[in-house]
Structure formats: structure tokens, C-alpha cells
Amino acid sequence: MKETIQGTGSWGPEPPGPGIPPAYSSPRRERLRWPPPPKPRLKSGGGFGPDPGSGTTVPARRLPVPRPSFDASASEEEEEEEEEEDEDEEEEVAAWRLPPRWSQLGTSQRPRPSRPTHRKTCSQRRRRAMRAFRMLLYSKSTSLTFHWKLWGRHRGRRRGLAHPKNHLSPQQGGATPQVPSPCCRFDSPRGPPPPRLGLLGALMAEDGVRGSPPVPSGPPMEEDGLRWTPKSPLDPDSGLLSCTLPNGFGGQSGPEGERSLAPPDASILISNVCSIGDHVAQELFQGSDLGMAEEAERPGEKAGQHSPLREEHVTCVQSILDEFLQTYGSLIPLSTDEVVEKLEDIFQQEFSTPSRKGLVLQLIQSYQRMPGNAMVRGFRVAYKRHVLTMDDLGTLYGQNWLNDQVMNMYGDLVMDTVPEKVHFFNSFFYDKLRTKGYDGVKRWTKNVDIFNKELLLIPIHLEVHWSLISVDVRRRTITYFDSQRTLNRRCPKHIAKYLQAEAVKKDRLDFHQGWKGYFKMNVARQNNDSDCGAFVLQYCKHLALSQPFSFTQQDMPKLRRQIYKELCHCKLTV
């Protein structure tokens, strides 16, 4: 039988006072084979617990009263584990700086200890972070922010922010302060990036549905000392959808802060759509009959005014926009009439009514505002030696100024449409001719005889304005086209001198004399300072195809979209 030794430290346990129940150490299981008794070792900082056979009672254990530490039936491994626990406990006592006879002090007499050491708090942070990370990797959550809640707390503590959940302190009795955590708000920017929503999801985001907190499900939860009991989805008072959406997310609240019921045909999923409110679903889908109570709540709406679009129409619109985005790299050349025409061809129905056309326009605008749908980065159009990027094609949007890349590639498309008739000069030709004379551009036409063509097109770019020189070779006329109707007499003179020098070099003396210059005044005039490049491209196209100038300033938005498509297809629409 092993002899037990009990220390006589001043901080050891004393017999419990009146009203405190005795606490006994849990007995350990007996081993069949007794190991040889090791030499007893005294622990630093105190003695051993009482002998189980002595009949003494052990007071109730409170932090940091040491536990009974020796048992004859314990093995060496258990003793080592016990020593490690006691060492951790001693570190905890040292960290808290507890005075002697701490357990016998009253609650009101206990002084407030200092904050624990940094090592223990770091270990707690690491454990919390690893737990959240494992939950993020290996579990499927039914909430949008459940995993990131723990992770957000960990990040906030690492950054030194105030955390409402304090450590267990003897002064507070281990109670958790009931203060909402600032690091776990649903609108916190430290949360996960929102999923890429589909077309209906973008509509929900516009109506404020996406910003509402997710609906938790499951048993009652307690967080920060507050008890919260969720309502059942089947409860009519809860206002939640009675079915789980395909992506596993719960329904969300409407813009008024109340849970809204969606009609049966509105709970569809296109691209991670979380939920659909009743007001949006009524605008998008037909056949959703509102009850008398809902109609009474909405006296401003006309009776029987339902949505003219169904879910298959919305799905078709999204597929059309996806295909358009992949073909043209952006939705710049897209018009609502084009989408309406495709819908009419597919469904054999009329979509040109104001109500349906307005909803199609709303779908297009919502699709454009979705992340990643503005343009396709890396989209390029290559034709011969020309390469157009999205930055070049973006000059055709709105009232942007066209650059030289767009001008030169479109001119080559015009020239290749009627190659035997037209020759198009580069946009840098006139600038080089004006600064360096004929010697600077004499090699530009070494492989072509311009006097065998019928029409020469020379774009002129002076400062920030585009204009055009058109040369009728047979009639020996030089015509200046300017959408702002400015009279630039130097341009025709420079071109006339170039033609005379080229005639001498190519030995075409019949074209050396007889050139006349004109200014074309009865042409379409621009009303702004940004559409001069688009006017020049239309001048080139109509002159090459021998078409009259039937366009005006009001046609420029449509013509810009047409030029964009022609550049992407590398072919003019004749």
C-alpha cells in the first residue's frame, strides 16, 4: 500500500463552512495489474490532497482551488496528465494573481484580478479560428453568415477591436455580458463576399431583399446571453416560406422589415436566388392572384393588373443576355427592341406592349448592374493588323470620342466591302503629310495605284475633331465633309499637292492637273462635340456604297451600336 503525503501550505483547502455541501473526488478505475509504486514527488507550490481513507471532506471546487492529485491506482500516464493539468492551473492562478484563501472569500470581498496572460488568449483565439475554419470547409450551413460569425469575431480580436465577450472572471461569476457583438453584424464588411446572383437576384437586391439578415432555423439558440426562439416555417404568424429553396438558404425579409410570402410560382432559382418578394413576383410573373386582404392593403393598385412576364420569359431573357455578352464582350450594342424581337420569335407572343417592354428594359438594366456583367475583360477583336480591345470598343458607348483604332479598322472594313472601288487612307496619313510633306508618305501607296480607284477616303483629325476628305478620281474633285460645317481650306490644298506628286511618281500625267476642291454643306450636322467620329464613319460607309446621307443626330445612338456590331463581326451591314 502506497503512503500518501499531504502538504501544509497556507493556501490549502479547509473544512467547508456551514451551508456548503462536501465535494468528493471522483474515484478512478482499478487496474488488474498494479505497477510498481513510483517515488512520490512533491509538486512546486503546495502539497497533496487528503487521503481518501481519512474520512475528511473536500470543499466544493472553485477556481483556482487545486484538485486532489494523488491516487494509488493511477498509472504513470495518468499522473503525467494530472501534472500537466495542475501546471496549467498554477499558471492560471499566477495569471490571475489570486490572493491566499481565495475560495473562502465572499463575492463582495473579492478584488478584481488583472487580465490573463497573452498566451492563453492567443490559444483561445487559435482554437476558435480553427473551429470556424473546419466548419467552413466540411459542413454545409443553412445560414448565410453562420461560419463567418465566428471568423469575424476572431478577426476583430486579432485587430485589437473591443470584444464584448470577456473572459471568465471571479468578480462577475463567469456570466457573459449581454452586449451585442459589433464584429458580428449582418452588414459587416468583414463577412464573405456575396454570391453572384442571377437576374432575379439582382432585382431582389434593388428592392432591399438581399440586404436583410438570413432566417436561422433549428432549435433555440443562445448568443451573448440572449435567448432567441425562431418560429417554424409552417407557422402562419411567422411569414416564412414553407419550403426550402434549392440552394439551401432561408427566406429573407422584405423592404418593410416584415417577412413576406411569395406566390407559389415565384419561388424559382436562376443563379443563387435567395427569395422573391410578393411585390417583385407580382410585377414579373402572371397568374399570381392576390387575396382580398392583400388587395385591401394596396388600394393604389388597380384590380386585375398582373405581371405580363412568366418565369420562362425571365429565363429566356437571361440566356439572351448571356449569349450577347459572350459575343460582343459587353452590352453596349444591345437595345431593348432587339431583345423584344427575339422573345417574340421564340414564344410567338407580343412583347412590344409598353408594360412588357418596360419590364424587359428593367431586366436588362438589372443584368448590367450585376458584378461581372458590365464587360468581359480580355475580349478582343482581331482583323488583319488591327486588334481592338474593350477600351477601344468602349469609345462607341454614349458620347465618348472615337479613337484611331476604331477609325482605321472600320475604314478597312469599308475598303474591303468594295475593294475595286475604294481606297481608305490611315488616320495618321494626313498628319504625316502636313508635317513632313510628300516624302513622308510616298511609301504608303507603293503597292497600290490610287488612280485606278474611283473613291479615295482620307480621315482628318485636327486637335479634337474628326472630318473627312473624299476624292472622286474620275471627276478630279476633292470634297471636304465636316459635321460641324467648318471651312478648312488648307486640307483640300494639301491633298491636291499630294495627288499631283503621286501622279508624277506613278507616271500618270493625266491626273497632274485639273483638281478642284469643294465643301459639302448640306450634310447631317452634329449637335454636340462628341459624335464627329461617328459621323465620319457614316460618311465613309454611305459614300462607298453610293447611298444618300439619310441619318441625323438623333440616329447616332443607334448607329454607334451598329458600328460596334460591325466591328465585332468584321463585316459591314449592307
Swiss-Prot record:
Gene3D superfamilies: Adenoviral Proteinase, Chain A
Compositionally biased residues, Acidic residues: 74-93
Regulation: On oxidative stress, SENP3 degradation is blocked by inhibition of its ubiquitination, which stabilizes it as it accumulates in the nucleoplasm.
Chain residue ranges for the region called Protease: 386-543
Phosphoserine carried by residues: S54, S73, S75, S169, S181, S188, S212, S232
Complexes and interactors: Component of some MLL1/MLL complex, at least composed of the core components KMT2A/MLL1, ASH2L, HCFC1/HCF1, WDR5 and RBBP5, as well as the facultative components BACC1, CHD8, E2F6, HSP70, INO80C, KANSL1, LAS1L, MAX, MCRS1, MGA, MYST1/MOF, PELP1, PHF20, PRP31, RING2, RUVB1/TIP49A, RUVB2/TIP49B, SENP3, TAF1, TAF4, TAF6, TAF7, TAF9 and TEX10. Interacts with EP300, NPM1 and CDCA8. Component of the 5FMC complex, at least composed of PELP1, LAS1L, TEX10, WDR18 and SENP3; the complex interacts with methylated CHTOP and ZNF148. Interacts with NOL9. Interacts with CCAR2.
Function comment: Protease that releases SUMO2 and SUMO3 monomers from sumoylated substrates, but has only weak activity against SUMO1 conjugates. Deconjugates SUMO2 from MEF2D, which increases its transcriptional activation capability. Deconjugates SUMO2 and SUMO3 from CDCA8. Redox sensor that, when redistributed into nucleoplasm, can act as an effector to enhance HIF1A transcriptional activity by desumoylating EP300. Required for rRNA processing through deconjugation of SUMO2 and SUMO3 from nucleophosmin, NPM1. Plays a role in the regulation of sumoylation status of ZNF148.
Name of the protein: Sentrin-specific protease 3
Name of the gene this protein is made from: SENP3
